[in-house]
Amino acid sequence: MPSAEQTSWVILAGGQASRMGGNDKGLVELTGKAMIEHVIGTLSPQTSSITINANRNQERYSQYGSVFGDNIQDYPGPLGGIHAAIHHLDDEWIGFVPCDCPQLPHDLVERMANACSEDTDIAVAHDGEHIQPVVTLLHRRILPKLEAFLANGDRKIILLYRQCNMITVDFSDQPNAFVNLNTPEELQQFGQTL
């Protein structure tokens, strides 16, 4: 089982943001701050190791921390960022969160790390109704499975997880913590509730 201090965390901001009108979701403003600032604000008290995976606007993202892009072209989705992170970071355990999830749990890192055992490959957050496949903590030993999966042209993240020793981590006490803001309308509605 890793301790929270033995994990590195990556904010996934590498997508095309097609539902956000092509605007980079991590840089879209929510209550006067870039959305990624909300994510960093929640994660930074929990871990000292935060990096950003971005394929566009890397210079802008670099004002928030260390940035790296995908190794695979054509936007393979979150799996591209996961693949790049395993190559970019040396840590055994790497956690991932999306850049468009501004209310992450304040105990995310600790709960995810505590749920893992020696044989866990992937821990995935569960909000009580659904798994949150991009809120995950994984062991780097999944890399061969991930590379074979991507080489086959597969992109559906949950299908990869099913090939691994996956556990779910219960966050049913905080179901609203995983609200993703994918469209300008969702962003506006969410901003009005804060």
Curated annotation (Swiss-Prot):
Localization terms from the record: Cytoplasm
UniProt keyword Metal-binding present: yes
Positions annotated to bind GTP: L12, A13, G14, K25, N53, D70, D100
Pfam families associated with the record: NTP_transf_3
Catalyses which reaction(s): Mo-molybdopterin + GTP + H(+) = Mo-molybdopterin guanine dinucleotide + diphosphate
UniProt GO molecular function: GTP binding; metal ion binding; molybdenum cofactor guanylyltransferase activity
Coarse class of the protein's main subcellular location: cytoplasm
Keywords: Cytoplasm, GTP-binding, Magnesium, Metal-binding, Molybdenum cofactor biosynthesis, Nucleotide-binding, Transferase
Database matches in CDD domains: MobA
Gene Ontology biological-process entries: bis(molybdopterin guanine dinucleotide)molybdenum biosynthetic process
Subunit organization: Monomer.
PANTHER family: MOLYBDENUM COFACTOR GUANYLYLTRANSFERASE
The name this protein goes by in its record: Molybdenum cofactor guanylyltransferase
Source organism of the structure: Photobacterium profundum (strain SS9)
